[in-house]
Amino acid sequence: MSDNLHDTQTVSVSILEKEYQVSCKPDEVKALKESASYVDEKMREIKSSGAILGLDRIAVMAALNIANDYI
């Protein structure tokens, strides 16, 4: 049995010009980067509308919109 801590790598992703360090398995790096890009795109759409201010509110609205797309 392998140790999960040793099976991960740290990946840097950028969302709204902010860098985040995220650990994931090597075979999940591509999906993580695509997910971060998708979240960044959705948050930018909300931010550019000007209707919602504050990074936390933009993030919550993006999360709700993304969840709605999959429900």
Residue ranges and their predicted role:
Residues 19-21, 27-34, 40-61:
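Amphipathic, hydrophobic secondary-structure cores in small proteins
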Residues 1-27, 34:
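A positional/architectural concept
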